[in-house]
Amino acid sequence: WCKKNCFPGKWPNRFRDSWERVLQFNKEKKFDMYQEEVMVPVGDWSKSRLKNLSETDKKRDPSKVQSGFGKNVSNWVGRDMVYPTNVLHLATECSNRKHSAAFPESLPEWFIKLFTKEGDVVLDPFLGSGTTAVVAKRMQRKYVGIDLLDENIEVSEERLLDS
């Protein structure tokens, strides 16, 4: 995920950390994915870019690598919402100050929407301060959290009681 407002840093030999890798796992090879739950607005670019489509834009372009996939630009006409990209752009703002690797609730919320329905189980093997569990509870999912540090478990239990 891309941190829109990452913390400033003053290091002599590296840049600020403005992105972080997010890992998501499923138990099964075949799993449900509810992409409609995380669709995003197309944006204003579509109005000008799709205004005057040529005839070649209205038919599928063959893939340059022979993958069988190509693009049909006219499929974008009239759409208000589209599937998101594979980079989440989120602000780092969060009210949790009890853990060094805190992240906004919108981060686990996006994944919970994408891969689960109400009543499903969300596992967080790095519980930390419990943000994922708090969001899962709010979204009517069951949750399991694992952490090595007792103080993290205490903080997350406190947050879950308050939520």
Residue ranges of model-derived segments:
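Core catalytic lobe of class I
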Residues: W1-L161
